[in-house]
């Protein structure tokens, strides 16, 4: 039997949806490739994160990776990932998230086939001031000239990439349906009042202020935020419950026993929580941003909203007959947004490059 080709993933943002994406993709590809993951631990990274990975996957922590720009740490991370790659001698390198993408594209000369997935460009993040966003875009523009293919995780992100480089493609994010279904099957379904939920860190990106406004406009509806974060004080409406940080099975239990998934984000890549909610046949009501609007088509498989009033109206509609919407969303995940489809498309691109 021929020796498996070595693939090295370099991941700085190992938390939230990116963590789930990396776990699902690596676990799916390990049957075909010898998988190595060089990563950084974040606050959102599960404490038992190693248990999520197939035992055949090699995990290597990058000690100097950090989210913020820090010249000393970033230079140290540059040499650290070069050393890791020199020891592994991978046949292909795939960089994930903006920080890994910037450092990695400078660190490697392109002799080894290299891919980069932004998972949401940093220059689109509205919590950064305009000057900082211009710097982030300049960094992406310079790095885009390197010998590297950018693979975006949604059509919208791909359109942004094409403004930077033509060496680009996209593969839609996908979810592990089998693993999710297993958790759903083990979850007790309980009677509950009409419930709207969201999932993730309570931070500027996820727009808790808008979530609170929507809840205040619908005092007869129960709202649940699955997660925690620095802006939890923004969630003041009396009909909002905050779960705090919970494990995956508990988060799914909350979701299963709810009716509508709301995602009022200011920006997104292609959210895993949205795809999982579509699979669970929840009515999905999302903001009109890249990622969300690539998956949800207004009135066909959910609702896309541009104002608090539109969110409120959509949730009111969701209290009526919605089976056609939720069934279409479910079928979309079965056909397009699942790990098997995603892994097969990546495998094809890897094979063409090695």
Identify the function of each model-found stretch:
Residues 19-24, 194, 198-217, 230-233:
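A conserved mid-protein helix/loop that constitutes part of the nucleotide-sugar donor-binding site
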Residues 9-22, 28-73, 160-162, 229-231:
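N-terminal strand-loop element at the rim of the active site
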Residues 60, 141-184:
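Donor nucleotide-sugar binding/catalytic pocket of nucleotide-sugar-dependent glycosyltransferases
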Residues 85, 245-246, 253-258:
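Short alpha-helical donor nucleotide-sugar binding micro-motif in glycosyltransferases
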Residues 297-309, 316-322:
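Conserved acidic donor-binding segment of nucleotide-sugar-dependent glycosyltransferases
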Residues 323-352:
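A charged, aromatic-enriched C-terminal amphipathic alpha-helix characteristic of glycosyltransferases
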Residues 266:
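Aromatic "clamp/platform" in nucleotide-sugar-dependent glycosyltransferases that forms part
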Residues 283-286:
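Short hydrophobic beta-strand element within catalytic cores of glycosyltransferases
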């Amino acid at each position: 039997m021929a020796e498996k080709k070595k693939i090295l993933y370099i991941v700085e943002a190992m938390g939230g949806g990116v963590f789930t994406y990396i776990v699902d993709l690596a676990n799916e590809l390990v049957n075909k490739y010898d998988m190595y993951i060089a990563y950084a631990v974040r606050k959102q990274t599960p404490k038992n994160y190693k248990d999520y990975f197939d035992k055949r996957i090699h995990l290597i922590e990058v000690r100097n990776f950090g989210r913020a720009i820090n010249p000393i740490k970033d230079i140290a991370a540059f040499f650290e990932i070069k050393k890791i790659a020199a020891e592994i001698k991978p046949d292909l390198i795939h960089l994930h998230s903006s920080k890994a993408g910037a450092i990695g594209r400078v660190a490697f000369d392109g002799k080894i086939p290299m891919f980069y997935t932004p998972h949401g460009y940093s220059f689109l993040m509205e919590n950064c001031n305009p000057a900082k966003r211009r710097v982030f875009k300049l960094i992406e523009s310079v790095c885009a000239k390197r010998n590297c293919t950018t693979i975006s995780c949604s059509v919208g992100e791909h359109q942004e990439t094409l403004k930077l480089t033509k060496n680009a493609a996209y593969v839609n994010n996908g979810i592990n349906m089998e693993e999710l279904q297993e958790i759903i099957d083990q979850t007790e379904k309980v009677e509950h009042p009409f419930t709207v939920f969201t999932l993730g860190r309570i931070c500027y990106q996820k727009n808790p202020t808008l979530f609170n406004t929507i809840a205040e406009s619908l005092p007869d509806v129960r709202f649940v935020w699955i997660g925690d974060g620095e802006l939890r004080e923004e969630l003041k409406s009396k009909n909002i419950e905050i779960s705090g940080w919970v494990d995956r099975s508990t988060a799914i239990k909350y979701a299963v026993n709810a009716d509508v998934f709301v995602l009022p984000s200011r920006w997104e890549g292609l959210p895993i929580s949205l795809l999982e909610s579509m699979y669970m046949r929840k009515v999905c009501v999302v903001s009109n941003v890249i990622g969300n609007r690539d998956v949800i088509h207004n009135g066909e498989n959910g609702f896309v909203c541009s104002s608090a009033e539109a969110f409120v109206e959509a949730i009111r509609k969701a209290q009526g007959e919605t089976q056609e919407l939720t069934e279409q969303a479910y079928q979309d995940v079965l056909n397009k947004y699942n790990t098997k489809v995603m892994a097969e498309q990546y495998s094809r691109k890897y094979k063409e490059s090695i």
